[in-house]
């Protein structure tokens, strides 16, 4: 039997029913578990987990992730800025330094800004109060409908709809037939990601376009393997502008959302479910790519 890669799907909040807890990523987990090799053997052993906190304020798994058997961490930063302790970030950083693959994603404004202290991939995430986008002209609202959410808040469409994207030819962006993916789930206020200065191994592989301003913005930044100054071969990594590309509500709005979500959902995926294939191809590509780095 093949050796399954072990994937940890992890949020940065304790389980809270009326929030983006890990149970709201069940369609993603189901899809990853359905992927198999040519002999029909499952490729991935998937664990889905919300943050757990000891009295000291650390998460016992994340703070020692480098000592675990996991091969990949898919980290959904759904916190308001305090979702990862310094010890958690250190454990995750060591995990990548020992070759672990990381997919990191967040959302608008400062949502998920605990990612800033992650080594390497954390520098690709831009927020409102800290680690802002390098271009000052982008320090302004893009989405002008949901007025209680400040920048970065790129409007790519309604939850439940899809956005048409631009991609480069990359292992992450290819369909099984060799053509390139064209669609990802839309969101009214995506966050901001970019290539950190002097990081040659990073590239923007998918770009969206705001439906309100027409501005292009990065959706996916891919980090190839790299050797750090201490000789560690760091695993591959991905920085995404919004966890809404992967959450159940954006794949199927009939699954529901927390009560604080104000915007009415769209129905494009319900009417044209075949468009959802592209994000599923991306997910399969990401799992394979993060596993394969060497």
Regions found by a protein language model. Name each.
Residues 58, 132-241:
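Catalytic beta-strand/loop cores that center a nucleophilic Ser/Cys/Thr
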Residues 23, 40, 57, 81-83, ...:
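Residue-identity detector for glycine
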Residues 10, 80-179:
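A glycine-rich, often tryptophan-bearing local segment used as a flexible ligand/cofactor-contacting loop or short
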Residues 21, 45-64, 113, 117-143, ...:
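Surface-exposed intrinsically disordered loops and tails
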Residues 24, 33, 49-51, 94-98, ...:
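Arginine residue identity/basic-tract feature
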Residues 1-34, 69-74, 112, 204-294:
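Extracellular ligand-binding/catalytic regions of CAZymes and related secreted enzymes
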Residues 15, 21, 31, 108, ...:
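Histidine (H) residue identity feature
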Residues 6-121:
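Helical hinge/lid and interdomain linker segments adjacent to catalytic or ligand-binding clefts
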